[in-house]
C-alpha cells in the first residue's frame, strides 16, 4: 500500500498500513533460540526423541550404540541438550542417565500434534 504525503510532505500516522510490531522479550528470545538451536541437529534431535520415548532414564552407554556416531559426538550432543534445559542427568556408579524435561515433553508433543501423529 502506498501512502500519500500531506500537502506539506509529511506522512499522516493515521494512514499507516499496519500496526507497529510488538515488543520482544530479549531474554525469552535468547532462551527460545538456545532450545531450538539445540534441537536443530540430527544427532541431538534423535537422542532427544530416544530419551523421551524411553520408559525411564536412558544410560549414555545405550544411546551410544543406537545413533551411529562416536562416543565423543554423543557426549557433546547430550551436554548441549542438558545446557539447553531439554534433559536432566543423574549419575549412578560410573554411568550417566538422561531423562527428558517437561519442556521437552511439551515441545515434542506439540511437534507430533502439528504433524498429526500424536499417540
From Swiss-Prot:
What Gene Ontology terms describe what this protein does at the molecular function level? DNA binding; DNA-binding transcription factor activity
Q: What InterPro entries does UniProt report for this protein, alphabetically?
A: ArsR-like_HTH, HTH_ArsR_DNA-bd_dom, Metal_resp_trans_reg, WH-like_DNA-bd_sf, WH_DNA-bd_sf
* Induction (free text): Constitutively expressed.
Keyword annotations: Arsenical resistance, DNA-binding, Plasmid, Transcription, Transcription regulation
What Gene Ontology terms for biological process does this UniProt record contain?
response to arsenic-containing substance
Which SMART domains is this protein grouped with?
A: HTH_ARSR (SM00418)
Q: What is this protein called?
A: Putative arsenical resistance operon repressor ArsR2
Amino acid at each position: 500500500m502506498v501512502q500519500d504525503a500531506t500537502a506539506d510532505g509529511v506522512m499522516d500516522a493515521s494512514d499507516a498500513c499496519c500496526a507497529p510490531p510488538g515488543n520482544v522479550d530479549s531474554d525469552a528470545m535468547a532462551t527460545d533460540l538456545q532450545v531450538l538451536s539445540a534441537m536443530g541437529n540430527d544427532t541431538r534431535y534423535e537422542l532427544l526423541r530416544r530419551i523421551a520415548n524411553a520408559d525411564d532414564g536412558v544410560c549414555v552407554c545405550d544411546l551410544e550404540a543406537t545413533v551411529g556416531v562416536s562416543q565423543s559426538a554423543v557426549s557433546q550432543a547430550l551436554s548441549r541438550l542438558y545446557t539447553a534445559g531439554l534433559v536432566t542427568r543423574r549419575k549412578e556408579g560410573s554411568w550417566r542417565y538422561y531423562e527428558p524435561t517437561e519442556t521437552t515433553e511439551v515441545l515434542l508433543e506439540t511437534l507430533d500434534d502439528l504433524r498429526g501423529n500424536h499417540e
